[in-house]
Amino acid sequence: FLGVLNIINGSAGMFVNIPSLIIVFGGTLMVTMMRSSMSDFVGAVGVAGRSFGNPLEKPEALIEKFVEYAELVRKDGMIALESKVSEEKNEYLKRGLEMLVDGKDKGYVSTQLTKDTEIMVIRHERGADIWSAIGDFGPAMGMIGTLVGLVQMLANMSDPKSIGPAMAVALLTTLYGAFLANVIAFPIQQKLKQRMVDETLNNELILTALNFMQDGGNPRVL
């Protein structure tokens, strides 16, 4: 962002104002922490990081994997999946494979994995809610900073040197608030919502395929 501003007018430094940053980002953080618990806030940051850093498998890739697993099961039984458990990076699928290897029945597997999906949905919904709150509080803090800057400016009209810094606080807090909301918070919120939908669909696909293998289904059907 600052790089773009630097290209436009050759000086990104004029868009950096420490008091404005403290008002917007510090104020937003404080209000968000008052609204929710520390664990929820940390969880929201963590789930956002995982959403950007750990891409989900494509459904097509999962289907190909299950065709291989189903063929293995038809040849050598469920115990043959034990060699695949340690290789599996998808924690949800890995947990399912472990239960199949342990001989858990279909109802047990479905219940446990459905609970895992429900927990994942709650985690993502909480994260999205907190990022939505940050998006709401950011512009509000920007408006507060603008009012603070205007009050400082009007209170020192007799001193021309103080008008510039006060006006900078007034304008830049509005800019920072809009930036925090529309460039950071709301995009992350939407990312979490989409991630939740995609991960839920993947989990449903995995559960269906695991149950299919438990029923002794033909790999060609997959």
Protein language model features and the residues they cover:
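Helix-termination/interfacial motifs at the ends of transmembrane alpha-helices
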Residues: 1-12, 116-195
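Large intracellular
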Residues: 4-127, 199-222
